[in-house]
Amino acid sequence: MDANFEMPPVGGMNDDDDMDFGDGASFLKVGEEKEIQQGLKKKLLKEGEGYETPENGDEVEVHYTGTLLDGTKFDSSRDRATPFKFTLGQGQVIKGWDIGIKTMKKGENAVFTIPAELAYGESGSPPTIPANATLQFDVELLKWDSVKDICKDGGVFKKILAVGEKWENPKDLDEVLVKFEAKLEDGTVVGKSDGVEFTVKDGHFCPALTKAVKTMKKGEKVLLTVKPQYGFGEKGKPASAGEGAVPPNATLEINLELVSWKTVSEVTDDNKVVKKVLKEGDGYERPNEGAVVKVKLIGKLQDGTVFLKKGHGENEEPFEFKTDEEQVVDGLDRAVMKMKKGEVALVTIDPEYAFGSNESQQELAVVPPNSTVTYEVDLLTFDKERESWDMNTEEKIEAASKKKEEGNSKFKGGKYSLASKRYEKAVKFIEYDTSFSEEEKKQAKALKVACNLNDAACKLKLKDYKQAEKLCTKVLELESTNVKALYRRAQAYMELSDLDLAEFDVKKALEIDPNNREVKLEQKRLKEKMKEFNKKEAKFYGNMFAKLSKE
């Protein structure tokens, strides 16, 4: 699943893990639909190979597209061109998946209609899936493999001695706490710890530990058989205090327990805002943009100097702010929107997302220029901004209008990125208008045109010319003679060096409004740019022919 969408389990391990649902569902004809159980339906689109189906514990690999019943797509591995992998029957996905995919053969393609009680139930999975939603998944089962050979090359075999809790596994950035004892095949102890903490990607002792912990759950105990390439290879390891030497090319046996771990995640794609969970929160909901949050905060410099402390004093009220309103530094704003209620996290923020290159006087100390800062954040409560599915049609139009006005205000203040977000949110409120009255559809259309046009202006300011072009095209699909859309798309085309397309839009705009001053100025700028381009092209071909004639 992608970074913004989670497929959490509903109710943990399945009660139906030992039951067989394959008799009917595995022998459907193409185009036939049948109920498997509890309202879960399967429709066969393409037959698979052979007769085998995956079992609990198998690691399956699928492509899927998930939609609501109205056709709204909320997630797709196909769009990412990356198959989705999970372990069947371990509660890593919704219950409907664990049941349904056990009925599939390799290469089979089917559509599963999954009722809410086998999906996300009454809570849904905001912001993409409403409460009590019946879902449809178009799933293709690509393959499945045994999980025992964890590196798929015979280098590390894993035998589970004690099953772990829940369904999560540590990731590369996480800090794990493990106990282990490593022996040679003759029983000689060559490594041992009753509790060592390390970052997964940095590893500890030998490469096999990193490989293994990424497949383990909290509290899981395993026996690893480790070949030399994941141990100490051709060089081996010299003896140390209380531990024997590892000879060259030795196979190891390691008893390993994953005691716990602290989840560390990248809040931003550039790894400049990182969040480490110190205490897990409750549920799956997180604050959205525009949510009102209440937190306890401690802000520190890298040397430990405390520059901010909120909500920790006796009888002191929690610190309250509204997300996505620049009321706190950008990195903190983004991190809080990744937290759950009750979660305590340590957020490390590079200067770019904190106070930048300027000195900043804070409550308890000065933050010097270009400072990396940390915040310990305790998210106490939050009130989310209402989502579109919680509104009737009148409220959706009203909310879209409000977001448009907020966007206009941000634009006038030169805050183009924030303005763009407001316009995008406005359009989302009214994107699906099938339930609108005719009058409401007219209002929604006018709002879509205005917001997409204004958003295009933001994208031009932000130099995101490709997105500006796409937004103008959306407007022209609604109003083919919209001069502003033609004008702004021409600007985008010029910056993208698509001069012929820019010329077409300018000419069309002037046909509609011959006296438009802005378009005329753009036409003049376009002619100058085309003249400059033609000169460069002539020079290029002149030099090329000169070289050819010399040869």
UniProtKB/Swiss-Prot annotation:
The protein's Enzyme Commission number: 5.2.1.8
Primary residence: cytoplasm
Pfam families: FKBP_C, TPR_1
Residue ranges of every copy of the PPIase FKBP-type domain listed in the record: 57-145, 173-262, 290-383
GO biological process terms held by the UniProt record: cellular heat acclimation
Gene3D superfamilies in the record: 3.10.50.40, Tetratricopeptide repeat domain
PROSITE patterns: FKBP_PPIASE, TPR, TPR_REGION
Renumbered residue ranges of the record's region Calmodulin-binding: 529-545
SMART domains per UniProt: TPR (SM00028)
InterPro entries: FKBP4/5/8-like, PPIase_dom_sf, PPIase_FKBP_dom, TPR-like_helical_dom_sf, TPR_rpt
Annotated localization: Cytoplasm; Nucleus
GO molecular function terms listed in the Swiss-Prot or TrEMBL record: calmodulin binding; peptidyl-prolyl cis-trans isomerase activity
Subunit field text: This PPIase probably binds calmodulin. Interacts with HSP90-1. Forms heterodimers with FKBP65/ROF2.
Family, as annotated: Belongs to the FKBP-type PPIase family.
Descriptive protein name: Peptidyl-prolyl cis-trans isomerase FKBP62
Species whose genome carries this gene: Arabidopsis thaliana
